[in-house]
């Protein structure tokens, strides 16, 4: 949450590699849409798209809605596709393997839809098929059913609360994790950030967790707990 709060207030030029990934994503999205089949694309205008999405879903026709839009407290969320009849969400990624962030994307989309009174029964991720070769019969995209994973995570996720957190004037209290090592806002969250235990070489999650459990965040404090200190060389 703390990283999201800072990112929401950061504006930097988009580097060339990310621009290329964006265009790559557009191409893969079109390939996926061709494989899904015909559907009704919502307007580019986000406000009009929100209105049309709800109207189209209310018709309960057996068709795919492309780029639907859901308004949550003034923030518009646009999933890649949703079936108006089966209430299936589809998320398209220009990648070959599953990542945790992709599950979260589906959770956000599901939460936005259900915030607007649209129940979601299943969640599907579409990835580039690594087995596809030009001219063969393998599909260009593969589908992964993530319904169970998305439903479980959705039990503790509230999109309205997340949006409210991003809008609050002060950042949420930071929680130290091993991933903080690569965060550009580390020094803004923690004093003496260079002395944090996350900088210990080859520190595994198994060794890291007991330190936090004993409120030890800085290397200068490690020697105060001899048993934990000894685990670093075990």
Label for each model-derived stretch:
Residues 133-148, 185-203:
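Short His/Asp/Glu-rich catalytic/ion-coordination signatures at enzyme active sites or charged loops
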Residues 112-116, 188, 214:
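Active-site catalytic microenvironments for nucleophilic, acid-base chemistry
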Residues 1-87, 206-222:
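Metal-dependent nuclease catalytic cores that hydrolyze phosphodiester bonds in DNA/RNA
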Residues 195-233:
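Helix-hairpin-helix
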Residues 159, 166-167:
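Solvent-exposed beta-edge/loop recognition patches
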Residues 18, 22, 95-103, 173:
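Short, charged/polar micro-motifs that form catalytic or ligand-binding hotspots
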Residues 50-64, 70-161:
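Nucleic-acid nuclease catalytic cores
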Residues 1-3, 167-196:
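Cysteine-cluster motifs in flexible loop/terminal segments that predominantly coordinate metals
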């Amino acid at each position: 949450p703390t990283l999201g709060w800072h990112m929401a207030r950061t504006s930097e030029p988009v580097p060339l590699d990310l621009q290329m990934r964006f265009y790559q994503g557009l191409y893969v999205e079109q390939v996926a849409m061709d494989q899904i089949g015909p559907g009704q694309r919502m307007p580019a205008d986000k406000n009009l798209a929100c209105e049309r999405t709800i109207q189209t879903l209310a018709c309960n026709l057996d068709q795919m809605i492309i780029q639907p839009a859901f308004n949550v407290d003034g923030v518009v969320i646009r999933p890649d596709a949703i079936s108006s009849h089966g209430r299936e969400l589809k998320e398209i990624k220009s990648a070959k393997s599953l990542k945790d962030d992709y599950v979260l994307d589906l959770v956000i989309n599901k939460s936005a839809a259900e915030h607007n009174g649209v129940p979601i029964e299943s969640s599907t991720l579409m990835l580039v098929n690594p087995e596809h070769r030009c001219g063969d019969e393998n599909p260009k995209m593969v589908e992964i059913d993530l319904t169970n994973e998305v439903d479980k995570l959705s039990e503790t996720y509230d999109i309205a609360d997340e949006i409210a957190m991003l809008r609050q004037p002060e950042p949420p209290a930071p929680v130290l994790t091993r991933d903080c090592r690569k965060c550009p806002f580390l020094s803004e969250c923690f004093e003496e950030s260079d002395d944090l235990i996350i900088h210990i070489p080859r520190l595994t999650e198994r060794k890291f967790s007991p330190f936090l459990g004993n409120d030890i965040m800085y290397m200068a404090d490690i020697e105060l707990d001899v048993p934990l200190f000894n685990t670093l060389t075990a």
